[in-house]
């Protein structure tokens, strides 16, 4: 009897095969259950070790509870849930770090794990995604940041000639600022100093980056600078467009703000790109750099040509405009905000202003202007600067971070790709580190001998720490010291007695004082400032 082995005929079943199959199925089920139990236990452990936090409402999460003054909301929540807690903004889970211990453990001890930026829509817009400040953490990012930091350090803090150039830029703008403040205060009038400080600081950074300055009346320059507050609100912690991206898909105020944000970034990028192209065209081969843009272009061209002389990392040429955008944009905004705080505090604490002026008169005298060389001998001026930074915490929460790997802080599990907010304000207002933190007291930074306490100054957190620490920190502190020293040496500042004692502020990436009025009078005359600027111009003409 013949047999057929057609592909359509079933194979005969062997009883042993049935037993083996049953055993394999049973083992598979047991293995699946075992793995599932392990994963469930691991998930439960992670949930048990996840940071605590408040109940989050559907759709909006904790957005309503955070409000505008996010740093204060975070500090209040930290008192209930601890220094590491979790909130939800929209559908985005966010871990918030408060206090020096938690922040140091995350950003310094585990710097690489917390060095990324979230994939936020607003971050992708800045400099077309090439921004160092808002860009993702990668090997390429590390090389570019190291190059930019090295260039800034060498260009302004290590070379005496470059430091003198910076002092000259600040002197010129301080002279113009004094003249405008005094003119606006004629006949006992009071004026809002904020617009003038914005242009003054931006002009210093324009001279540093591009080798040029603008008139305070220049409409295009003033328009460019007028969007600082809008930019800060959009990229700051808790921006709705980033945590509720679905708001971009139908008409609403958030979408309108985001489209305006896109336009202002295009305008700003075009402004920087125009400067970059003009510098590339006018830069002579072998010439010394005229400004920071030149220095970055020359470094990038050497890298492109394969010149490794001098070693160290170098910027890619295509990244120069974005890097200059970061330096110019961030510096002029944060420094003008800081200078506004310094003037506000002078008027609200006249005894502090008097003591600053007395120290300047004693150390510098009345026959010349303060300079960087005077800084070691002006401890109270430095104490005033650091107390102003601590008290105002004008950058209350850093640009949002993101984790690059599964990690933990103070025993709490934080998964990879988690958005992290860092509350710098909580460090600067910690009552365990700063007695009576809500009191403004520069003397807290002086030791028993009246010298600056460097251990305390290092605890002030305003420029972040770790891998994302601001590369312009030294340059910023130099400018603030020079500005406030020259202004205090030359002028008296008086508050408007009709203004309420309680101040109002706008919140975003920085805390900005809202409108306040001052009266500014010369302590002597403009002669010393005029003479110093004329001498500076004469030296520049001879060079």
Swiss-Prot record:
One GO BP: blood vessel endothelial cell migration
UniProt-recorded Gene Ontology molecular function terms: estrogen 16-alpha-hydroxylase activity; estrogen 2-hydroxylase activity; heme binding; hydroperoxy icosatetraenoate dehydratase activity; iron ion binding; monooxygenase activity; oxidoreductase activity, acting on paired donors, with incorporation or reduction of molecular oxygen, NAD(P)H as one donor, and incorporation of one atom of oxygen; oxidoreductase activity, acting on paired donors, with incorporation or reduction of molecular oxygen, reduced flavin or flavoprotein as one donor, and incorporation of one atom of oxygen
Effect of mutating residue 330 to S: Associated with ocular hypertension susceptibility
Effect seen on changing residue 57 to C: In GLC3A; juvenile onset; allele CYP1B1*11
Induction: By polycyclic aromatic hydrocarbons (PAH) and 2,3,7,8-tetrachlorodibenzo-p-dioxin (TCDD).
Listed result of changing residue 423 to Y: In GLC3A; juvenile-onset
Subcellular location: Endoplasmic reticulum membrane; Microsome membrane; Mitochondrion
Any Gene Ontology CC annotation: endoplasmic reticulum membrane
Regulation: Enzyme activity is increased by liposomes containing anionic phospholipids, phosphatidic acid and cardiolipin. Inhibited by naringenin with an IC(50) of 5 uM. Enzyme activity is increased by cytochrome b5.
Annotated positions for site Major determinant of CYP1B1 17beta-estradiol hydroxylation regiospecificity: 395
Effect noted on mutating residue 395 to L: Invertes the 4OH E2:2OH E2 hydroxylation preference from 5.1 to 0.45
Effect seen on changing residue 387 to K: In GLC3A; allele CYP1B1*20
Associated disorder: Anterior segment dysgenesis 6: A form of anterior segment dysgenesis, a group of defects affecting anterior structures of the eye including cornea, iris, lens, trabecular meshwork, and Schlemm canal. Anterior segment dysgeneses result from abnormal migration or differentiation of the neural crest derived mesenchymal cells that give rise to components of the anterior chamber during eye development.
Family: Belongs to the cytochrome P450 family.
Protein name, UniProt field: Cytochrome P450 1B1
Organism: Homo sapiens (Human)
